[in-house]
Curated annotation (Swiss-Prot):
Disulfide pattern: none
Role this protein plays: Catalyzes the hydrolysis of N-formyl-L-kynurenine to L-kynurenine, the second step in the kynurenine pathway of tryptophan degradation. Kynurenine may be further oxidized to nicotinic acid, NAD(H) and NADP(H). Required for elimination of toxic metabolites.
UniProtKB keywords: Hydrolase, Tryptophan catabolism
Source organism (scientific name): Eremothecium gossypii (strain ATCC 10895 / CBS 109.51 / FGSC 9923 / NRRL Y-1056)
Protein name: Kynurenine formamidase
Amino acid sequence: MQRDYTATEVFQESGPDAIVYLHGGAWIDVRNSPRDFAELAARVREDAPLASQYAVTYRLSPEVQHPVHVADCVEHISQLIVEKGIRKLHLLGHSVGATLCWQILTALPGDRRYPEGPDFAMKLALVRSSLAHVFLVDGIYSLRALLEEYPDYDYFVNKAFKSLKDFEDPSESAERISAGPILHVIHSYKDELLTLKQTQYLTAVLTAHQIPYKLYVDDLGLHEDVYRNEKVAAYIVAQLP
């Protein structure tokens, strides 16, 4: 059953600097939602009371497929920027939320693998123009590498994508990363669903393209614990002005 994909979770409204969270759930899991970040947002609020905090959602597969997920995220984030007067945006995505963050950074309007039309291009440009930090937390970045390591994960990949050809690998898209936002790649040693291979794949691509990034690897709990972890909250706060 699909939930209300237009729902935005408001954790804190404090000013024009804002963190926006994107949840995971393998593009298919209704158990993951913007509320995933309630505990993390509360931890961040303790030490960063001037940062507004929101979380958005997106329609799930198999009812819809890529690129609808990224189109929904861009739509909702751009709406927040306009309605809340956000001037400095910090994105944090967990699991496929990190995938979506990467796609927001690198999507090429007009490419068949991404949403079509001038409306998407305009809203994507607005989101990118506001970006300051992007936190990629225990993310999926290469479907090809993912399925080589976890063949059984095709059960959700095949629901979210008509074909692997519809997914642009970071090795193809990294060259379009702008010099603006600071990238943070975060991974938990204890993640039982994703080893470090996805993170290592992405950082190798970033290094090959000489794109600066910050890497934070630590014991941050299991896959569904990372986005509640106090160390992650402390890391985020340390990056904010």
